[in-house]
Amino acid sequence: MLFKTHDLKDWQVEILTKFILEAGEEPRIERVGKVLEKEEGVRMEEVSGYLILLQKNAIKSLIKLLAERKKTKTRRLLCDALSEVGKNAIDLFTPFLEDSRWFLVRNIIYILGRIGKEEALPYVQRALTHEEVRVRREGIQALGLIGGSKASGMLVKALTDEDPRIRAMSAINLGKTGRKASLLPLLEVVQSKEFPKKGSDEIRAFFEAIGMVGSNEAIPVLQQLLEKKSWFARGKADEIRIGAANAMAMIGTPEAREILDAGRASKDEALQDACLQALRRKASKEPTV
């Protein structure tokens, strides 16, 4: 409860608790739904402030309301409120993961991600095999928010998903963890024979993820890709070269900088361009004094 109940007398706390519990009963939640339907003249921040005061007895009714609402703004408000109300009640959300409405399942995964507790991981993992790709994508985002070694392990498995966007999202979320344990699977992918066949967005995501980890351990592989002569079409080879250079610039250590400076002075035009681009990009993102 968000109120400072230590400032109140016992009888006041009892009345206040009873009021909040009654506010979470289904008829009251239905009234909130009718208010939200109007939208015009409704102060959403006030509705949100009211909802986050509710207790876990309101969760099922709020989820029912969430399933019925069509407007994105309203659904987001309900999801965010449920993320607060349900912090210690994950078990009340999990039955809805079996719902036939994919959009509701996606919303439940969104909520579990924002609650951010490791105990939700087995349920988020189930979302990674859902037939609807949008549910799987939400599962990847949730893993990134929950974090930890178990979530990272699930993200590694998702690097081989059939959907390229999910593979890219998995890579980025692995990079955000900054864990060296995440680096090896990322490096394995960029060195694979299949990697040059991937789309531009996916290639860029993997190199960005490697750069996020920020470890010198990536430098030998990145240097090899940066300086490699390729039999692939020039455009694809340049994409990989630029990606490797950008990752090196993100790592930003003296060792990485030395390789980029050497590449900038190279007579190989493609190598020179990649290193120059990476250094300029790095400089543009650095704060000015």
Q: Where are these predicted regions, by residue range?
A:
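Short inter-helical turns and helix N-cap capping residues of alpha-solenoid HEAT/ARM repeat scaffolds
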Residues: E39-E40, K70-K71, S100-W102, E131-E132, ...
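Alpha-solenoid helical repeat scaffolds
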Residues: L54-A58, L77, V85-A89, R106-N107, ...
